[in-house]
Amino acid sequence: MKTTRKGLRDGELEKDTYGRLTCSECGESLKKKNDPDEVFSVRICADCGREWKELR
C-alpha cells in the first residue's frame, strides 16, 4: 500500500479545488478509515477499492 504523497507524485491521486484527495482513475473523493491502534489512516476509493495510507 502506497502513501498518499507517493500516490500524488505518481499521478494516482489528485487534489480538487478545495484540497480534497480524489482518485484519478474514477474521479471519486476518497473516504478515510481511522484505526486508533495504527500510526496512519487509510484512504479508500469507494468505486475501485484502491487504498493509500496517510500518516497522521
From Swiss-Prot:
Coiled coil: none
Motif (C(P)XCG motif): 23-27, 45-49
Gene Ontology terms for molecular function: zinc ion binding
Superkingdom classification of source: Archaea
Binding site for Zn(2+): 23, 26, 45, 48
Impact upon substituting residue 48 to A: Loss of structure and stability
Disrupted gene: phenotype observed: Cells lacking this gene show a late onset of growth in synthetic glycerol medium, a lack of swarming during the first 3 days, and enhanced biofilm formation. In this mutant many motility and chemotaxis genes are down-regulated, and some genes encoding pilins and redox proteins are up-regulated.
InterPro entries: HVO_0758-like
Key words of the record: Metal-binding, Zinc, Zinc-finger
Substitution effect: residue 45 to A: Loss of structure and stability
Quaternary structure and partners: Monomer.
The protein's role, per its UniProt record: Zinc-binding protein that binds one zinc ion. Is involved in biofilm formation, swarming and glycerol metabolism regulation.
Entry domain remark: Consists of an N-terminal alpha helix with several positively charged amino acids that is placed on top of a globular core, which is stabilized by the zinc finger.
The protein's name: Zinc finger mu-protein HVO_0758
